[in-house]
């Protein structure tokens, strides 16, 4: 018979971490996976206006100038705010309906044809109803 082998004892891990890539950095997609969902939930909870006030007021004044033949009208801040609230509510409702059409078509991306069909279904006025 030959010499007996020593039984192997499991090695202990060092108490300090070994330098090298961490486990989290090896999977960068895991963290970004639900960022879009987190952003959607944050925006749904908020009641803030999403359009900037100054560019919106410029567009309102430009459109108003076309209808009044160049006469510059003064707008109250509350009137602009009410108009912006209505415009954002209209756009949110439009995109909700367009997204339903997108899901019906078996897609997740809204195409211009979805917006056009939404407006056509709503009719000429196309209000919030």
Swiss-Prot record:
Subunit structure and binding partners: Component of centromeric nucleosomes, where DNA is wrapped around a histone octamer core. The octamer contains two molecules each of H2A, H2B, CENPA and H4 assembled in one CENPA-H4 heterotetramer and two H2A-H2B heterodimers. CENPA modulates the DNA-binding characteristics of nucleosomes so that protruding DNA ends have higher flexibility than in nucleosomes containing conventional histone H3. Inhibits binding of histone H1 to nucleosomes, since histone H1 binds preferentially to rigid DNA linkers that protrude from nucleosomes.
Region annotation Disordered: where it falls in the sequence: 1-30
Major location (coarse): nucleus
Species of the source: Cricetulus griseus
Protein name: Histone H3-like centromeric protein A
Membership in a protein family: Belongs to the histone H3 family.
Modified residues (N,N,N-trimethylglycine): 2
Post-translational modification: Trimethylated by NTMT1 at the N-terminal glycine after cleavage of Met-1. Methylation is low before incorporation into nucleosomes and increases with cell cycle progression, with the highest levels in mitotic nucleosomes.
SS bond partners: none
Keywords tagged on the record: ADP-ribosylation, Centromere, Chromosome, DNA-binding, Methylation, Nucleosome core, Nucleus, Phosphoprotein
SUPFAM superfamilies: Histone-fold
Biased composition (Basic residues): 1-14
């Amino acid at each position: 018979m030959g010499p007996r082998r020593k039984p192997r004892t499991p090695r202990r891990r060092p108490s300090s971490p070994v330098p090298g890539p961490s486990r989290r950095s090896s999977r960068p997609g895991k963290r970004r996976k639900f960022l879009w969902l987190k952003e959607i939930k944050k925006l749904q909870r908020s009641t803030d206006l999403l359009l900037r006030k100054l560019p919106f007021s410029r567009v309102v004044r430009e459109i108003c100038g076309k209808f009044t033949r160049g006469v510059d009208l003064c707008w109250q801040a509350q009137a602009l705010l009410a108009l912006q609230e209505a415009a954002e509510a209209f756009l949110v409702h439009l995109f909700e309906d367009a997204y339903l059409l997108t899901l019906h078509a078996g897609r997740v991306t809204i195409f211009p044809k979805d917006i056009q069909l939404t407006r056509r279904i709503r009719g000429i006025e196309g209000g919030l109803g």
